[in-house]
Amino acid sequence: MEAAGELEPEVLILGSAADGKLGQVVVGSTADRLLHSSPVPMAISPRGYRGSKAGGLTRITAAYPGTPDTLYVVERVAALAERLGVPMRVVTFAVRGRTMYPPEVGLSTEDSILEQLATHARETLAQLKVDGVVGKDVDLQVVSGNGWDESLDNADWQEGDLLAIGTSPVGGIARVFLGSRGSKILRHSPVPVLVLPG
């Protein structure tokens, strides 16, 4: 982090740790320390990732949970996509937990609650265009699945995609600090992830 302070990089780029599942981001001890202390964005690729055959970045996806404190992720990704001349999309993940409710409540109740969450997420995403946060051409999607792994797999990735996620500030300091949701997205992402300090 000392070198980052002196060199003032725009982003730190890391590969995944050598152990773990191929095709997913594997956070080793060095990356973990950096993920909890970096004042600059960090990019980390899935284990075994070889890059795009197309020769570069083709689209940036902002993971947006729809909360006001994470709007900065969408704004920063919109600026980055414009600067790099690539399309952007915004995705909200509606994830069915392993067990959302006791069995006596019933699966139809879980389905109903998940659909209500997805409906609210679609309305929140649509508001991004109404408010001018993103352009009319930005793709907005709610992606669901049974667990984080299935949800991330269902996100219709393209070769050359980059996923951007936000973090929470620690004690008012803009540093990378992944919450549980961000950690799960990072761990299950099949594409490189850009982690933006909050």
Region spans (language model):
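Small/aliphatic-rich secondary-structure junction motif
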Residues: T58-D111, D131-V133, D137-Q141, G160, ...
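A short acidic, glycine-rich active-site loop
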Residues: S108-E123
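Short, well-ordered amphipathic alpha-helical segments that serve as non-catalytic structural scaffolds
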Residues: V73, H120-L128
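Conserved hydrophobic residues forming the short capping helix/wall of the S-adenosyl-L-methionine
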Residues: A4, A81, L125-V133, A155
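Active-site phosphate/pyrophosphate- and oxyanion-stabilizing loops and adjacent acidic/basic residues
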Residues: D32, A78, A126, V130, ...
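Gly/Ser-rich helix-loop-strand patches that form or flank binding pockets
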Residues: M1-S52, N154-G198
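Charged docking surfaces used in two-component/phosphorelay signaling
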Residues: V142-S151
